[in-house]
């Protein structure tokens, strides 16, 4: 098959953007009709450069642009391509979304995790809110007991095992002082990536959940935006871990708007520790 240089560059640019967006998986890059020899991928001068090298859900020309009419911006109706089908889709890759996705995958479900940024952790890692809250309970005697279990407990123990103060303190059952552990943000991102990959969760970074797909009151999936455009994921179960209830809101659920407290997080480096 022969294509023009302009068409090749357009496909290459679109696919590069989709790859950076995390919305394109390796198994979508199909080559039909031929077995590719080494070095032929992406090279139109070699055998195997086939018509489906960068299959996109639509081309630029297929997407209708918004336009002005009587001073209003009108968005034409369009088909939203179904990009993926799964058992469970989790929207939001913060601590809650990370734990929900890993837990569901470990139970045998096929899980997709949609995260708007390029790393896991949400405000926990990217927002530097690094304190592990509610890890302990104060007994009647005044003693603090470590009560965290499940995936959070596993995360803390594995973070501690990484060393380099990734998790700087994990209280034991014998501690009689109250300690809130903190975690290094980059170490936490690495560990979350590791646990998600181990569980077999399918990750979609740089993908922002913007709407839901409904049949009456039943939610059948989510619509998300990425560099590849607006696409849909169909799922048997949809889990809202956006932090702000974005999926609930899009589905028409009742909500109450509140103002969260402000915080100022700082970190210091190259300072010797002194024990008081």
Q: Which residues make up each language-model segment?
A:
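Rossmann-like dinucleotide-binding core of oxidoreductases
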Residues: 245-276
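Conserved N-terminal/central alpha/beta ligand/cofactor-binding core
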Residues: 13, 39-61, 67, 83, ...
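Extreme N-terminal leader/targeting segments of oxidoreductases
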Residues: 2, 7-86
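Short, well-ordered coil/turn residues at beta-beta hairpins
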Residues: 11, 225, 241-242
